[in-house]
């Protein structure tokens, strides 16, 4: 992991230094995924079973996980694990419940009322990756907001065999539709539906290059499903001053570096001594990490940057837009108003990135690869949709009609204009008739 002095670089060199590792999908992945998606659409469950056997080297007895299997998985877990998962569930639920919005009702002018109401997305699909270790935390991050939002149907897919921890957390989140399928075939099944797997409106969750490509393809097809956000490799950026603990910084950088060879970690500090001590601490801590080889590969594209000031650190961070941003300075809270682009921010010495990954309450599904400029961390709103309502009285329409008529004429949309004027004419006729009735009665 190299150390550089920011001011010693030209603008082009500075820009090049902040380039993320390239995402190498390749035409072959695109073609493979397209074939898988088409196969699942055409042959449904039969294709799912064959593809699962081909890619995961196992043919499940049943595509759907039974209630008995979930109960058995729960019984196999230790009390310690259950308690940890329950605590994480409570914290995540508490934070996401607080994100509920109240209906909005505004009278924009006399007789014109506008409202905004929220409804849950009817059906959602959650993808939980397989791999060497189970990811119950991802089930929590997706399942809890889906549950709180009130999504009527929640489908969960994960490669077989599904870990006990995943099944237990699914139960905590009230998820009963769980399927033994993974990879791009699972994304296709949720996007288009099969005899066993229900079609969903939106798909959430991380995955490898094949899963990411499948999500991209189905989201670009109007017959497919929406997705949560673009995905990329994990990343963390740390802003530190002279009060920061180098051991803490090193641990935080390595916690992201161990995710994968394509992860990127960055330190920004105006203190050369901090950069040097962090570099030493990284080498010491690497010696005891089981995933040290993976972390070393990630460190190859990672950097320790020495700046002139903390203000310069903030400027660089805002330009880079990290997935995770850790602020270890004397007064970290004071920097928050100055930070514009980050997925999730961790303030102070006692807020390691790991707590956000698991149990602080915030969501760990975050935009990466610079998408923090336009995307937000996953939250309750992602499992909901907003509808607007307007209601006008007759007097309200009369007041607003000239504005609408003028604008419709300017845009050459006569039917729009007519939808207003036909009502105004009807009102005028009613008023004339009413006046005549009054005159007749008085006579």
UniProtKB/Swiss-Prot annotation:
Note the CDD domains from the entry.
Histidinol_dh
Chain residues that bind substrate: 234, 256, 259, 324, 357, 411, 416
Amino-acid biosynthesis in keyword set: yes
Q: Required co-factor? A: Zn(2+)
What are the binding positions for Zn(2+) in this chain? 256, 259, 357, 416
Q: Which reaction does it catalyse?
A: L-histidinol + 2 NAD(+) + H2O = L-histidine + 2 NADH + 3 H(+)
Provide the E.C. number(s) assigned to this enzyme.
1.1.1.23
Binding positions for NAD(+) per the UniProt entry: 127, 185, 208
Q: What cellular component terms from Gene Ontology apply here? A: cytosol
What are the UniProt keywords, alphabetically? Answer: Amino-acid biosynthesis, Histidine biosynthesis, Metal-binding, NAD, Oxidoreductase, Zinc
| Catalytic site positions | 323-324
Is-annotated flag, keyword Amino-acid biosynthesis? yes
Pathways involved: Amino-acid biosynthesis; L-histidine biosynthesis; L-histidine from 5-phospho-alpha-D-ribose 1-diphosphate: step 9/9
Physiological role: Catalyzes the sequential NAD-dependent oxidations of L-histidinol to L-histidinaldehyde and then to L-histidine.
What family is this protein classified in? Belongs to the histidinol dehydrogenase family.
Tell me the HAMAP family matching this sequence: HisD
Protein's name in the database: Histidinol dehydrogenase
Gene symbol here is hisD
């Amino acid at each position: 992991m190299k150390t550089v002095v920011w001011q010693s670089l030209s603008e082009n060199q500075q820009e090049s230094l902040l380039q993320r590792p390239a995402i190498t999908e390749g035409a072959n992945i695109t073609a493979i995924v397209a074939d898988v998606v088409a196969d699942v659409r055409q042959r449904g469950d039969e294709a799912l079973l064959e593809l699962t056997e081909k890619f995961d080297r196992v043919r499940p007895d049943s595509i759907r996980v039974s209630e008995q299997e979930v109960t058995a998985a729960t019984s196999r877990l230790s009390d310690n694990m259950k308690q940890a998962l329950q605590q994480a569930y409570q914290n995540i639920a508490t934070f996401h419940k607080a994100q509920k919005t109240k209906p909005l009702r505004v009278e924009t002018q006399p007789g014109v009322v506008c409202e905004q109401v929220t409804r849950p997305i009817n059906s959602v699909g959650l993808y939980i990756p397989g791999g060497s270790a189970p990811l119950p935390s991802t089930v929590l991050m997706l399942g809890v907001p889906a549950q709180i939002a009130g999504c009527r149907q929640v489908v969960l897919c994960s490669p077989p065999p599904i870990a006990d921890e995943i099944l237990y957390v699914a139960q905590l989140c009230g998820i009963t539709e769980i399927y033994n399928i993974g990879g791009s075939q699972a994304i296709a099944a949720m996007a288009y539906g099969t005899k066993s797997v229900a079609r969903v409106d939106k798909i959430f969750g991380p995955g490898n290059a094949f899963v990411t490509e499948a999500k991209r393809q189905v989201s670009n097809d109007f017959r497919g499903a929406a997705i949560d956000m673009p995905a990329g490799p994990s990343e963390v950026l740390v802003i530190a001053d002279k009060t920061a603990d180098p051991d803490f910084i090193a641990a935080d950088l390595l916690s992201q570096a161990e995710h994968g060879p394509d992860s990127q970690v960055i330190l920004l500090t105006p203190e050369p001594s901090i950069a040097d001590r962090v570099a030493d601490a990284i080498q010491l801590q690497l010696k005891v990490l089981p995933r040290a080889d993976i972390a070393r590969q990630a460190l190859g594209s990672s950097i320790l940057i020495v700046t002139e000031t903390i203000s310069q650190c903030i400027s660089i961070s805002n330009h880079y837009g990290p997935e995770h941003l850790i602020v270890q300075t004397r007064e970290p809270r004071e920097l928050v108003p100055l930070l514009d682009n980050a997925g999730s921010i961790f303030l102070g010495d006692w807020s390691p990135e790991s707590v956000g990954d698991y149990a602080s309450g915030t969501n760990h599904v975050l935009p990466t690869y610079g998408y923090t400029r336009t995307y937000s961390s996953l939250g309750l709103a992602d499992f909901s949709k907003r509808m607007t309502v307007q209601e006008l009285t007759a007097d309200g329409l009369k007041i607003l009609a000239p504005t609408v008529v003028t604008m419709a004429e300017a845009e050459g949309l006569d039917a729009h204009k007519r939808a207003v004027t036909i009502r105004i004419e009807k009102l005028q006729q009613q008023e004339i008739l009413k006046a005549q009735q009054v005159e007749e009665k008085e006579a």
